[in-house]
């Protein structure tokens, strides 16, 4: 490519003025339409000195009106201003969709496009009318141009956060992540997302971006995001969107990263268990049945099972502990409930009765006999109660089942 020479400091020649006037008189649908339409190549092109040979086509910051020769396609561009308005940039970007893909993939053409859109790229990513054109740019971009696009996004983490949390912006970001190939690109994206991960977790669209990182990149890289989530575990777990992202983190975490995240949840189990969203994080790790973890949660909640069993959200955690914990740990919960002075109230509670039924379902031997005996002692208070009679029915059903089994065993023995 011919190296370019600056002409912005001197008065333009008559030939240059003719070229400018010719460009001004040409109807344009967008800034890039001269690349789409057929123009006679400028026979006496002005060559413009660029910051470097590879960036020669980014010389759109000259103050006077300037004609620029694109050597790669033999067509010219015309620019009047040092900065482009958002609406103008939008019109330019929409015109990109009309370009043949082969022409769009030309390195110099791509440099021109990115050079003109760089100040508004983040805003354009959030415009529904520009999404198709931006995706076309991704498809046609080389590794070097994808790196440049990524840099445009991550240099301002406030703007990146805004894009990731936007309906259309989130989709475009996810597509960009799919085009990252080099380790430098991936690491740059991961650390950029890490910086804003707490806010993204608390957004539906932002959560999709984080989940996409988990799908595309290795645990060795995504652990940096999960570590940031662990540091802010309670804040994220108690958010409507955050509790879902936290479960995704638990699913993808490995080894020490998972250990740290679980430790944070367990240490805050008493707070999370009663929370409308936080309880889902506790339920999730209880169902994982990791040795020692459920026993630690049972210990953390000790002394409050009667209260928790009558709580709309916490009762689900108690049920899961009864179902997925070891027998000895479940027995501790059952004994605390039985010896509570509120046991009758628990049986009659809209949520507590399900906890008692789950206890009956998951205990055996002496613990079951003791629990069923205490329940039957309260028969006068339960048989007419809408929730109490459910528990009585459960006890009676299990008793009948055991009697049938005994009868079958006796019949086979004879």
Q: What residues fall within each predicted segment?
A:
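Eukaryotic gene-expression regulator signature that favors modular helical reader/repeat domains
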Residues: 1-414
């Amino acid at each position: 490519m011919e190296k370019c020479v600056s002409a912005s400091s001197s008065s333009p020649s008559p030939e240059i003025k003719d070229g400018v006037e010719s460009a001004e008189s040409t109807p344009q649908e967008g800034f890039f339409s001269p690349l789409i339409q057929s123009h006679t190549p400028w026979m006496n092109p002005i060559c413009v000195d660029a910051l470097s040979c590879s960036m020669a086509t980014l010389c759109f910051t000259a103050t006077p009106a300037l004609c620029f020769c694109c050597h790669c396609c033999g067509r010219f561009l015309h620019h009047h201003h040092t900065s482009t308005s958002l609406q103008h940039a939008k019109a330019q970007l929409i015109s990109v969709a009309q370009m043949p893909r082969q022409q769009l993939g030309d390195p110099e053409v791509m440099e021109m496009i990115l050079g003109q859109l760089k100040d508004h790229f983040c805003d354009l990513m959030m415009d529904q009318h520009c999404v198709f054109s931006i995706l076309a740019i991704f498809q046609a971009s080389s590794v070097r141009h994808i790196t440049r696009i990524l840099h445009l996004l991550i240099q301002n983490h406030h703007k990146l956060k805004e894009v990731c949390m936007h309906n259309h912006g989130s989709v475009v970001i996810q597509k960009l992540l799919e085009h990252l190939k080099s380790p430098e690109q991936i690491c740059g994206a991961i650390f950029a997302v890490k910086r804003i991960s707490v806010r993204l977790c608390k957004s539906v669209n932002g959560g999709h971006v984080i989940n996409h990182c988990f799908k595309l990149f290795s645990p060795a890289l995504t652990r940096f995001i999960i570590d940031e989530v662990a540091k802010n575990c309670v804040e994220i777990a108690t958010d409507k969107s955050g509790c879902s992202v936290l479960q995704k983190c638990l699913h993808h975490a490995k080894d020490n990263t998972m250990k740290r995240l679980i430790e944070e949840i367990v240490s805050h189990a008493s707070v999370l268990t009663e929370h409308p969203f936080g309880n889902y994080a506790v339920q999730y790790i209880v169902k994982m049945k990791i040795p020692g973890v459920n026993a630690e949660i049972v210990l953390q909640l000790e002394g409050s099972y009667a209260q928790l069993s009558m709580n709309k959200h916490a009762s689900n955690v108690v049920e899961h502990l009864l179902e997925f914990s070891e027998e000895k740990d479940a027995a501790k919960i059952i004994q605390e409930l039985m010896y509570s002075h509120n046991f009758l109230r628990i049986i009659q509670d809209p949520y507590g009765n399900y906890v008692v039924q789950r206890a009956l379902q998951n205990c055996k031997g002496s613990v079951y006999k003791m629990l069923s005996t205490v329940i039957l002692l309260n028969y006068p208070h339960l048989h007419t109660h809408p929730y109490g009679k459910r528990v009585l029915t459960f006890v009676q059903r299990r008793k009948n089942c055991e009697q049938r089994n005994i009868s079958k065993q006796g019949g086979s023995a004879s």
